[in-house]
């Protein structure tokens, strides 16, 4: 606290002995010791309080940093959830659009390995009747 060496302390004691005398010196020394002790305890008290405040500030900063990290993580999760919802909606709309464009593909889908049978349809033979008599032949 004070940068006082032994030689300076001895000089102060000699001056105090000369000024106060041998009768009042012990009482003054006790009083000076009491003042020094009070000053040290006050200094230690202030120092401890300051350290507690600094620790409290550090804890508050750490808590705020942790809350910010949590907030950022929640925002990222919400963004990812919205992206997933959008992707699901797009997928559903894609499937609905495919069904609307090609409705027969969904109902008549063929599995691999099934045979496909082709049926040939021919038109009926042309009729020999004349068109003017409504399908009846002329008799002569």
Swiss-Prot record:
Record organism: Xylella fastidiosa (strain 9a5c)
Family listed: Belongs to the TatB family.
Record's keyword terms, sorted: Cell inner membrane, Cell membrane, Membrane, Protein transport, Translocation, Transmembrane, Transmembrane helix, Transport
Name under which the protein is recorded: Sec-independent protein translocase protein TatB
Gene3D superfamilies: 1.20.5.3310
Subcellular location: Cell inner membrane
GO CC annotations, alphabetized: TAT protein transport complex
Keyword Transferase: no
Residues annotated as transmembrane: 1-21
Polar residues bias: start-end ranges: 128-140
Residue ranges, annotated region (Disordered): 119-140
Membrane topology: Single-pass membrane protein
Gene: tatB
Subunit-level organization: The Tat system comprises two distinct complexes: a TatABC complex, containing multiple copies of TatA, TatB and TatC subunits, and a separate TatA complex, containing only TatA subunits. Substrates initially bind to the TatABC complex, which probably triggers association of the separate TatA complex to form the active translocon.
Main location: membrane
InterPro entries linked: TatA/B/E, TatB
A GO term for molecular function: protein transmembrane transporter activity
Function: Part of the twin-arginine translocation (Tat) system that transports large folded proteins containing a characteristic twin-arginine motif in their signal peptide across membranes. Together with TatC, TatB is part of a receptor directly interacting with Tat signal peptides. TatB may form an oligomeric binding site that transiently accommodates folded Tat precursor proteins before their translocation.
One of the GO biological process terms: protein transport by the Tat complex
């Amino acid at each position: 606290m004070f940068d006082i060496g032994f030689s300076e302390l001895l000089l102060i004691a000699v001056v105090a002995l000369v000024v106060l005398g041998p009768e009042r010196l012990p009482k003054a020394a006790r009083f000076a010791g009491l003042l020094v002790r009070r000053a040290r305890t006050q200094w230690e008290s202030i120092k401890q309080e300051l350290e507690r405040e600094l620790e409290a500030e550090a804890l508050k900063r750490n808590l705020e940093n942790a809350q910010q990290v949590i907030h950022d993580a929640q925002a990222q999760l919400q963004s990812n959830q919205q992206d997933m919802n959008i992707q699901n909606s797009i997928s559903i709309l894609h499937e609905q659009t495919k069904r609307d464009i090609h409705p027969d593909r969904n109902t008549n889908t063929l599995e691999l390995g099934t045979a496909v049978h082709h049926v040939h349809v021919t038109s009926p033979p042309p009729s020999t009747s004349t068109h003017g008599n409504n399908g009846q032949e002329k008799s002569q």
